[in-house]
């Protein structure tokens, strides 16, 4: 799992900086949330899935228990060459099935408005935006959004 965690940290920092010009404050935030996930990880309530292509990591998605009925979707990321090829939907389907299997009633996630393709995947899977917050400390004009999904059995 250590190499998976290193991949998640490295690629989130690299891609968000290159594609969204997010600051070092965001990089520190990534370190904090990933290490918190690792420290609290329980395979009965949490999961981390790494997409591989030709033996190399090519994307990630995770589920973390927020409370007994709520999960947080985290670390959803695809390498640029893997985007818009259906892999994001596959990762999302796997993560949401894990939530159903574990009996979660709701899933939430945090994203930024600039993540247009990811936001489309969220909408396609039934998530809806519930609120937004200025995160200018991460970069100019960065707005973080909270999206939620009620899980229907």
Where in this protein do the model-derived segments appear?
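Acetyl-CoA-dependent GNAT
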Residues: 1-81, 89-94, 98, 102, ...
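C-terminal "cap" of GNAT-fold acetyltransferases
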Residues: 1, 105-153
């Amino acid at each position: 799992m250590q190499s998976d965690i290193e991949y998640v940290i490295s690629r989130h920092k690299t891609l968000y900086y290159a594609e969204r010009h997010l600051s070092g404050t965001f990089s520190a935030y990534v370190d904090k949330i990933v290490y918190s996930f690792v420290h609290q990880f329980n395979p009965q309530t949490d999961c981390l899935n790494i997409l591989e292509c030709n033996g190399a990591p090519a994307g990630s998605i995770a589920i973390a228990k927020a409370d007994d009925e709520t999960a947080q979707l985290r670390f959803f990321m695809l390498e640029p060459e893997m985007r818009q090829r259906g892999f994001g939907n596959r990762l999302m389907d796997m993560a949401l099935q894990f939530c159903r299997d574990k009996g979660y009633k709701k899933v939430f996630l945090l994203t930024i408005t600039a993540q247009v393709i990811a936001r489309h995947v969220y909408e396609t899977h039934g998530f809806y935006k519930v609120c937004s917050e200025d995160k200018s400390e991460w970069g100019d004009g960065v707005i973080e959004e909270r999206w939620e999904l009620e899980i229907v059995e």
